Amino acid sequence: MAKTIVVKQIGSPIRRPADQRATLVGLGLNKMHKTRELEDTPSVRGMIRKIPHLVEIIEERG
């Protein structure tokens, strides 16, 4: 089974640059305090690293 991480949106995309909003959509997050379980890949880690002020890693599984 692949490693996964659980990510929670903690910041609002309002008044943020378009690329940061697009990164949130790419992670599957579109509303405050929603969580998403994602596969732990370098691309997902890079997206999280791009918007650390908007997301929080809740848990790492695997």
From Swiss-Prot:
Q: Does the keyword Ribonucleoprotein apply?
A: yes
- Please name the Pfam families in this protein's record: Ribosomal_L30
Q: Which GO terms describe its molecular function?
A: structural constituent of ribosome
- Return one Gene Ontology term, BP aspect: translation
Q: A single GO CC term, please?
A: cytosolic large ribosomal subunit
Which keywords accompany this UniProt record?
A: Ribonucleoprotein, Ribosomal protein
- Database matches in SUPFAM superfamilies: Ribosomal protein L30p/L7e
Q: List the Gene3D superfamilies.
A: Ribosomal protein L30, ferredoxin-like fold domain
Q: Per its UniProt entry, which superkingdom is the organism in? A: Bacteria
What binding partners and quaternary form does the record give? Part of the 50S ribosomal subunit.
Q: Which family does it belong to?
A: Belongs to the universal ribosomal protein uL30 family.
Q: Know the name of this protein?
A: Large ribosomal subunit protein uL30
Q: What is the protein's species of origin?
A: Ruegeria pomeroyi (strain ATCC 700808 / DSM 15171 / DSS-3)
Upper classification of the source organism reads: Bacteria, Pseudomonadati, Pseudomonadota, Alphaproteobacteria, Rhodobacterales
